[in-house]
């Protein structure tokens, strides 16, 4: 039976280390869970797709040398795409790649929880894909609300993302649930 689920690893790249908000606080747990997800999906024959965010200048430029897999992760992707927008499905060729392979379900993971990962999950859902959003295999950083000045923790950001995606755009899944769900659905 052909594989109909693909893992999407979004922006797990060295570029982020050069942003002022970079923090190592949640990094070890993220790397462990992301690697477990990559390994589990690859072991089950799911295509693993790696997405890199690319900009013309700065740490996200190809010339910077930072558009490469985040240290600590080992990913052997079946396909790699460069994006310039928040959604991995916008302007990358990823949509055509998925459709041509009969992919119906996406497992979304990577960096940042509330930005490119959430945007990709919404876009994928609206495009007809089933989506498993593995929030424990996403990474973000504390953020300050511009108007109120309140600082939001990564746990609060993750919870908010789960709240707005669950049941509308995605199934919120753990690493194990996402891998097992693929085994059941395929």
Over which residues does each language-model region extend?
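Acidic/histidine-rich helix-loop elements
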Residues: 17-28, 148-151
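Conserved H-loop
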Residues: 53
């Amino acid at each position: 039976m052909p594989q109909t689920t693909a893992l999407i690893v979004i922006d797990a790249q060295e570029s982020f280390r050069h942003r002022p908000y970079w923090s190592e606080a949640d990094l070890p747990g993220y790397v462990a869970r992301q690697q477990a997800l990559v390994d589990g999906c690859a072991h089950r024959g799911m295509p693993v797709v790696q997405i890199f965010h690319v900009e013309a200048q700065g740490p996200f430029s190809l010339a910077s040398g930072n558009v490469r897999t985040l240290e600590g992760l080992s990913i052997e992707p079946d396909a790699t795409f460069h994006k310039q927008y928040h959604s991995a499905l916008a302007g990358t060729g990823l949509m055509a790649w998925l459709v041509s392979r009969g992919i119906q379900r996406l497992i979304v993971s990577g960096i940042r929880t509330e930005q490119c990962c959430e945007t990709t999950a919404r876009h994928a859902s609206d495009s007809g894909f089933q989506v498993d959003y593995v929030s424990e295999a996403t990474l973000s950083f504390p953020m300050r609300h511009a108007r109120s000045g309140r600082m939001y923790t990564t746990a609060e950001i993750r919870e908010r993302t789960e709240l707005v995606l669950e049941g509308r755009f995605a199934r919120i899944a753990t690493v194990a649930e996402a891998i097992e769900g693929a085994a059941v659905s395929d």
